[in-house]
Amino acid sequence: MAENQYYGTGRRKSSSARVFIKPGSGNIVINKRSLEVYFGRETARMVVRQPLELVDMLGKLDLYITVKGGGISGQAGAIRHGITRALMAYDETLRSDLRKAGFVTRDAREVERKKVGLRKARRRPQFSKR
């Protein structure tokens, strides 16, 4: 591995992402595929690019990312969290800007478990008075 490489781990819902950044031309590779191929949805691509756009590093860093677990939205959020942590390892002065944008904090919301006797986590079966 390169000596000028920085690492960050990101998590969101049931997804976890490992992000490696190094100076380069702006290539983003996710699970050996490009960002455009991996995420079909434009919103997911925007979420991934958010921290890089905020600190003006979009074309200056190469990203190599492995992500597993969860769905599209969770994976995009995990990647964003990982990129944020890797950027902080790269340059600690970026922390305050990233914190203000809310990217540093891990989104702790998880799926609520299904309860016995209910149809979903909170949805009760229909009540019949008579």
Curated annotation (Swiss-Prot):
Organism domain of life: Bacteria
One Gene Ontology term from the biological process aspect of the record: translation
GO cellular component, one term: cytosolic small ribosomal subunit
GO MF annotations in UniProt: RNA binding; structural constituent of ribosome
Cited InterPro entries: Ribosomal_Su5_D2-typ_SF, Ribosomal_uS9, Ribosomal_uS9_bac/plastid, Ribosomal_uS9_CS, Ribsml_uS5_D2-typ_fold_subgr
Cleaved signal peptide residues: none
Annotated keywords: Ribonucleoprotein, Ribosomal protein
Protein name (record): Small ribosomal subunit protein uS9
Gene: rpsI
